[in-house]
């Protein structure tokens, strides 16, 4: 090869070399540029790949953690599955037991349906009985209203009769007191007349004393006292009888009666019997032998028959008999007591009938008046019928009155004891005993 400094041909060779060199340079530059650009791209891709590797590493760590967690979850799920299987076994056994119970319940349901049909029939029967009982209850209410009306009517009737009895007793007492006053005045007048006659007869007997026969039987003073003492003995007894019979259970009237009896004249309370005993004894000793002395005759009446018959007809044989409560006066209180007793017996019979219709129903079984239900028997037997104690006593008293074997006296004593009460209280007590 020739160096650069040698001589060459001018115009061809250098330009070709330069062109080739330029082409090579261009190619190399292009290659460099392409390689450098590719290198940059590759670097970028490497960086991206490194980032992806990092991300994948992070994701791998996460996945590993998640895998471990999932493994734990799998273990727990396995345990839960095992537990669920055990629960399933238990539930299957329970289900079988429930199925058995369901079968038994179905059997019981069938039985209950059969029982329901019977119970519906019983309910229908009980409804019919309830309707009958309601009708019976309404009938009992109607009877109760009727009994209450009868009760009020009987109470009013009893009060009215007791009031009438009280008025009649007051009228009879007033009449009796007027009769006593009239008899007292008559007795005083007759006593004055007898004193005058006895004084005149005493003078005539004093003249004829020596001419009287001596064979007259001596009458002792006790006989004279017996003839004269009944006035003093029977007068208080008459007061007591008037007080016992006349009041008829009126306390206020009884006090008035005692006050009026105390206001009687002194001649009625203390008759002059003791003062005339000596004179009567003298007149009796001078009686003739042929004329006996009557027990009810006054001492001066026999002399009046011998000497003055006209005066003996005007004057009674014994003036004290008008005051002494004799058989006539005793008969009047007896009539009053008999009428009162008869009225009380009639009331007792009415109350007894009311009682029987009140406490017994149509089947002759006792009924409670407050609740309207039948009372139970004593021993639970159908043959035994319960009775009230008041019914027994009323029936015994009624039987004793019908038999007449002494029970009437007890009933009369009870009635007299009840008549001494207030009429209103008597009526209430009698009616409460009946109810």
From Swiss-Prot:
Top-rank taxon: Eukaryota
Keyword terms: Acetylation, Coiled coil, Membrane, Phosphoprotein, Signal-anchor, Transmembrane, Transmembrane helix
Topology of the protein relative to the lipid bilayer: Single-pass type II membrane protein
Residue positions where Phosphoserine is found in the record: 232, 365
Coiled-coil parts of chain: 35-194
Composition bias type Polar residues, residue spans: 282-294, 302-320
Chain segments carrying region Disordered: 191-239, 271-435
Protein name: Protein GOLM2
Protein's organism: Mus musculus (Mouse)
Gene that produces this protein: Golm2
């Amino acid at each position: 090869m020739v160096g650069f400094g040698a001589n060459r041909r001018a115009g061809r060779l250098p330009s070709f070399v330069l062109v080739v060199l330029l082409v090579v340079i261009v190619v190399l530059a292009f290659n460099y540029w392409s390689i450098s650009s590719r290198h940059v791209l590759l670097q970028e891709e490497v960086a991206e790949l490194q980032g992806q590797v990092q991300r994948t590493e992070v994701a791998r760590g996460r996945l590993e953690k998640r895998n471990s967690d999932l493994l734990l979850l799998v273990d727990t799920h396995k345990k839960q599955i095992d537990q669920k299987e055990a629960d399933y076994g238990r539930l299957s056994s329970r289900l079988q037991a429930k199925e058995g119970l369901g079968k038994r319940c179905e059997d019981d349901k069938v039985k209950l349906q059969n029982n329901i049909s019977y119970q519906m029939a019983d309910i229908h029967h009980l409804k019919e009985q309830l309707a009958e009982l309601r009708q019976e209850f309404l009938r009992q209410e109607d009877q109760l209203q009727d009994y209450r009306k009868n009760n009020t009517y009987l109470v009013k009737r009893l009060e009215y009769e007791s009031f009438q009895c009280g008025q009649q007793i007051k009228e009879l007492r007033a009449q009796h007191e007027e009769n006593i006053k009239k008899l007292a005045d008559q007795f005083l007048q007759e006593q004055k007349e007898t004193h005058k006659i006895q004084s005149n007869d005493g003078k005539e007997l004093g003249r004829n004393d020596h001419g009287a026969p001596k064979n007259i039987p001596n009458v002792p003073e006790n006989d004279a006292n017996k003839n004269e003492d009944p006035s003093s003995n029977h007068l208080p007894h008459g007061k007591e009888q008037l007080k016992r019979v006349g009041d008829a259970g009126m306390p206020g009237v009884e006090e008035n009666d005692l006050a009026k009896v105390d206001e009687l004249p002194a001649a009625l309370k203390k008759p002059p019997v003791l003062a005339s005993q000596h004179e009567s004894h003298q007149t009796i000793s001078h009686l003739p032998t042929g004329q006996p002395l009557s027990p009810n005759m006054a001492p001066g009446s026999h002399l009046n028959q011998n000497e003055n018959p006209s005066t003996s007809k005007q004057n009674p044989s014994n003036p004290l008999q008008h005051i002494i409560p004799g058989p006539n006066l005793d008969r009047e209180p007896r009539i009053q007591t008999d009428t009162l007793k008869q009225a009380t017996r009639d009331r007792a019979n009415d109350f007894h009938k009311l009682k029987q219709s009140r406490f017994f129903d149509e089947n002759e079984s006792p009924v409670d008046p407050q609740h309207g239900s039948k009372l139970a028997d004593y021993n639970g037997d159908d043959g035994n019928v319960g009775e009230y104690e008041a019914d027994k006593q009323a029936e015994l008293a009624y039987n004793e009155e019908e038999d007449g074997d002494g029970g009437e006296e007890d009933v009369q004593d009870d009635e007299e004891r009840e008549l001494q009460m207030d009429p209103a209280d008597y009526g209430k007590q009698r009616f409460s005993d009946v109810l």
